[in-house]
Protein backbone atom coordinates (compact mmCIF):
# COMPACT_ATOMS: atom_id res chain seq x y z
CA UNK A 1 0.00 0.00 0.00
CA UNK A 2 1.47 3.34 -1.06
CA UNK A 3 2.09 6.18 1.37
CA UNK A 4 -0.50 8.41 -0.32
CA UNK A 5 -3.15 5.68 -0.16
CA UNK A 6 -2.28 5.05 3.47
CA UNK A 7 -2.74 8.74 4.31
CA UNK A 8 -6.15 8.96 2.62
CA UNK A 9 -7.34 5.82 4.40
CA UNK A 10 -6.02 7.10 7.71
CA UNK A 11 -7.91 10.39 7.36
CA UNK A 12 -11.05 8.55 6.27
CA UNK A 13 -11.00 6.08 9.16
CA UNK A 14 -10.21 8.78 11.73
CA UNK A 15 -13.02 11.00 10.48
CA UNK A 16 -15.49 8.12 10.55
CA UNK A 17 -14.38 7.19 14.07
CA UNK A 18 -14.96 10.70 15.40
CA UNK A 19 -18.26 10.85 13.50
CA UNK A 20 -19.39 7.61 15.16
CA UNK A 21 -18.25 8.95 18.54
CA UNK A 22 -20.32 12.12 18.12
CA UNK A 23 -23.39 10.07 17.21
CA UNK A 24 -22.84 7.81 20.21
CA UNK A 25 -22.56 10.79 22.56
CA UNK A 26 -25.62 12.40 21.00
CA UNK A 27 -27.65 9.22 21.42
CA UNK A 28 -26.72 8.90 25.09
CA UNK A 29 -27.54 12.56 25.74
CA UNK A 30 -30.87 12.23 23.93
CA UNK A 31 -31.87 9.42 26.26
CA UNK A 32 -30.63 11.17 29.42
CA UNK A 33 -31.37 14.89 28.91
CA UNK A 34 -35.03 16.07 29.06
CA UNK A 35 -36.42 17.35 25.78
CA UNK A 36 -37.23 20.82 27.15
CA UNK A 37 -33.59 21.28 28.20
CA UNK A 38 -32.42 20.39 24.70
CA UNK A 39 -34.88 22.68 22.91
CA UNK A 40 -34.59 25.66 25.26
CA UNK A 41 -31.00 25.69 26.47
CA UNK A 42 -28.88 23.53 24.14
CA UNK A 43 -29.95 24.74 20.70
CA UNK A 44 -26.62 26.43 20.07
CA UNK A 45 -24.62 23.38 21.15
CA UNK A 46 -26.72 20.96 19.13
CA UNK A 47 -26.43 23.15 16.03
CA UNK A 48 -22.66 23.42 16.36
CA UNK A 49 -22.20 19.69 16.98
CA UNK A 50 -24.38 18.99 13.95
CA UNK A 51 -22.14 21.16 11.80
CA UNK A 52 -19.03 19.33 13.01
CA UNK A 53 -20.61 15.92 12.46
CA UNK A 54 -21.69 16.89 8.95
CA UNK A 55 -18.18 18.07 8.09
CA UNK A 56 -16.66 14.85 9.42
CA UNK A 57 -19.17 12.78 7.49
CA UNK A 58 -18.32 14.59 4.25
CA UNK A 59 -14.61 14.22 4.96
CA UNK A 60 -14.96 10.51 5.65
CA UNK A 61 -17.05 9.86 2.55
CA UNK A 62 -14.71 11.87 0.35
CA UNK A 63 -11.52 10.18 1.48
CA UNK A 64 -12.98 6.67 1.45
CA UNK A 65 -14.15 7.30 -2.12
CA UNK A 66 -10.74 8.68 -3.04
CA UNK A 67 -9.07 5.65 -1.48
CA UNK A 68 -11.26 3.31 -3.52
CA UNK A 69 -11.29 4.98 -6.93
CA UNK A 70 -7.69 6.16 -6.65
CA UNK A 71 -6.30 2.73 -5.81
CA UNK A 72 -5.17 0.02 -8.24
CA UNK A 73 -7.84 -2.52 -9.13
CA UNK A 74 -6.43 -5.19 -6.80
CA UNK A 75 -6.63 -2.79 -3.83
CA UNK A 76 -10.23 -1.69 -4.37
CA UNK A 77 -11.72 -3.55 -1.45
CA UNK A 78 -15.49 -3.48 -0.80
CA UNK A 79 -15.09 -2.16 2.75
CA UNK A 80 -14.00 1.20 1.33
CA UNK A 81 -17.33 1.64 -0.45
CA UNK A 82 -19.30 0.40 2.57
CA UNK A 83 -17.51 2.88 4.81
CA UNK A 84 -18.01 5.71 2.31
CA UNK A 85 -21.77 5.13 2.40
CA UNK A 86 -22.11 5.30 6.20
CA UNK A 87 -22.47 9.08 6.52
CA UNK A 88 -24.75 9.62 3.46
CA UNK A 89 -26.98 6.71 4.49
CA UNK A 90 -27.20 8.04 8.05
CA UNK A 91 -28.11 11.54 6.89
CA UNK A 92 -30.70 10.24 4.42
CA UNK A 93 -32.28 8.01 7.07
CA UNK A 94 -32.57 10.80 9.64
CA UNK A 95 -33.91 13.22 7.02
CA UNK A 96 -36.60 10.76 5.91
CA UNK A 97 -37.58 9.93 9.49
CA UNK A 98 -37.70 13.63 10.37
CA UNK A 99 -40.05 14.47 7.49
CA UNK A 100 -42.27 11.48 8.24
CA UNK A 101 -42.49 12.38 11.93
CA UNK A 102 -43.27 16.03 11.15
CA UNK A 103 -46.10 15.06 8.80
CA UNK A 104 -47.57 12.58 11.29
CA UNK A 105 -47.25 15.13 14.08
CA UNK A 106 -48.95 17.81 11.98
CA UNK A 107 -51.88 15.51 11.14
CA UNK A 108 -52.40 14.51 14.77
CA UNK A 109 -52.18 18.15 15.85
CA UNK A 110 -54.79 19.24 13.29
CA UNK A 111 -57.11 16.44 14.37
CA UNK A 112 -56.65 17.34 18.03
CA UNK A 113 -57.27 21.04 17.39
CA UNK A 114 -60.40 20.24 15.38
CA UNK A 115 -61.77 18.16 18.23
CA UNK A 116 -60.90 20.83 20.78
CA UNK A 117 -62.45 23.62 18.70
CA UNK A 118 -65.59 21.56 18.33
CA UNK A 119 -65.92 21.31 22.10
CA UNK A 120 -64.97 24.90 22.85
CA UNK A 121 -64.51 27.36 19.98
CA UNK A 122 -63.30 30.10 22.29
CA UNK A 123 -60.35 28.08 23.54
CA UNK A 124 -56.97 29.33 22.32
CA UNK A 125 -54.62 26.98 20.39
CA UNK A 126 -52.51 24.79 22.69
CA UNK A 127 -48.99 25.86 23.53
CA UNK A 128 -49.57 29.33 22.11
CA UNK A 129 -47.51 30.98 24.83
CA UNK A 130 -44.80 28.36 24.52
CA UNK A 131 -44.36 29.14 20.84
CA UNK A 132 -43.67 32.78 21.62
CA UNK A 133 -41.29 31.96 24.44
CA UNK A 134 -39.33 29.44 22.41
CA UNK A 135 -38.95 31.91 19.58
CA UNK A 136 -37.68 34.59 21.92
CA UNK A 137 -35.21 32.32 23.68
CA UNK A 138 -33.83 30.51 20.63
CA UNK A 139 -30.15 31.09 19.93
CA UNK A 140 -27.82 30.24 17.08
CA UNK A 141 -24.05 29.70 17.22
CA UNK A 142 -21.60 32.44 16.44
CA UNK A 143 -21.02 32.64 12.71
CA UNK A 144 -24.46 31.23 11.95
CA UNK A 145 -26.18 32.91 8.96
CA UNK A 146 -28.70 35.58 10.03
CA UNK A 147 -32.19 34.24 10.66
CA UNK A 148 -34.93 36.50 9.33
CA UNK A 149 -38.20 36.97 11.14
CA UNK A 150 -40.65 34.26 10.16
CA UNK A 151 -37.93 32.03 8.70
CA UNK A 152 -38.61 28.31 8.92
CA UNK A 153 -36.18 25.78 10.34
CA UNK A 154 -35.20 23.37 7.51
CA UNK A 155 -35.62 20.43 9.91
CA UNK A 156 -38.80 21.76 11.50
CA UNK A 157 -42.47 20.98 11.09
CA UNK A 158 -43.46 24.19 9.28
CA UNK A 159 -41.24 23.66 6.26
CA UNK A 160 -42.82 20.24 5.65
CA UNK A 161 -46.46 21.22 6.14
CA UNK A 162 -46.21 24.71 4.56
CA UNK A 163 -47.50 26.28 7.76
CA UNK A 164 -46.27 29.47 9.48
CA UNK A 165 -42.99 29.23 11.35
CA UNK A 166 -44.87 29.70 14.62
CA UNK A 167 -46.05 26.08 14.37
CA UNK A 168 -42.55 24.87 15.20
CA UNK A 169 -42.36 24.13 18.91
CA UNK A 170 -40.80 21.61 21.26
CA UNK A 171 -41.97 18.06 20.76
CA UNK A 172 -43.35 15.96 23.63
CA UNK A 173 -41.33 13.31 25.42
CA UNK A 174 -42.88 10.56 23.28
CA UNK A 175 -41.46 12.14 20.14
CA UNK A 176 -38.06 12.45 21.80
CA UNK A 177 -38.12 8.75 22.67
CA UNK A 178 -38.91 7.80 19.08
CA UNK A 179 -36.16 10.03 17.70
CA UNK A 180 -33.69 8.59 20.21
CA UNK A 181 -34.43 5.10 18.91
CA UNK A 182 -33.82 6.18 15.32
CA UNK A 183 -30.63 7.94 16.36
CA UNK A 184 -29.52 4.73 18.09
CA UNK A 185 -30.02 2.84 14.81
CA UNK A 186 -27.87 5.34 12.93
CA UNK A 187 -25.24 5.20 15.67
CA UNK A 188 -25.12 1.41 15.41
CA UNK A 189 -24.60 1.63 11.66
CA UNK A 190 -21.81 4.18 12.11
CA UNK A 191 -20.05 2.04 14.72
CA UNK A 192 -20.27 -1.07 12.54
CA UNK A 193 -18.97 0.89 9.56
CA UNK A 194 -16.07 2.23 11.60
CA UNK A 195 -15.13 -1.20 12.99
CA UNK A 196 -15.19 -2.90 9.61
CA UNK A 197 -13.08 -0.09 8.13
CA UNK A 198 -10.47 -0.52 10.87
CA UNK A 199 -10.42 -4.28 10.34
CA UNK A 200 -10.19 -3.76 6.59
CA UNK A 201 -7.30 -1.31 6.79
CA UNK A 202 -5.23 -3.34 9.24
CA UNK A 203 -6.11 -6.58 7.45
CA UNK A 204 -4.62 -5.45 4.16
CA UNK A 205 -1.15 -6.64 3.19
CA UNK A 206 1.56 -4.01 3.59
Swiss-Prot record:
InterPro entries: ATG33
UniProtKB keywords: Autophagy, Membrane, Mitochondrion, Transmembrane, Transmembrane helix
Coiled-coil annotated residue ranges, if any: none
Tagged with keyword Transmembrane: yes
GO biological process, one term: macroautophagy
Compartment list: Mitochondrion membrane
Record's bilayer topology term: Multi-pass membrane protein
Polar residues bias spans: 114-125
Transmembrane segments: 13-35, 52-72, 78-98, 183-203
Region (Disordered): 111-130
GO cellular component: mitochondrial outer membrane
Protein function: Involved in the selective degradation of mitochondria via autophagy during starvation and at post-log phase.
Entry similarity comment: Belongs to the ATG33 family.
Entry protein name: Autophagy-related protein 33
Organism: Zygosaccharomyces rouxii (strain ATCC 2623 / CBS 732 / NBRC 1130 / NCYC 568 / NRRL Y-229)
Lineage: Eukaryota, Fungi, Dikarya, Ascomycota, Saccharomycotina
Amino acid sequence: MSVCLGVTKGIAVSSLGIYAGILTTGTICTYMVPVDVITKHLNSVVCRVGEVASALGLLSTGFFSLSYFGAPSHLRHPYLIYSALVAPASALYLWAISRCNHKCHAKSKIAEQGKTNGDNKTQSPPLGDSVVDLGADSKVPSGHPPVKEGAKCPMGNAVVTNEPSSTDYARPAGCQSKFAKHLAVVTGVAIIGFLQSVIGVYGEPA
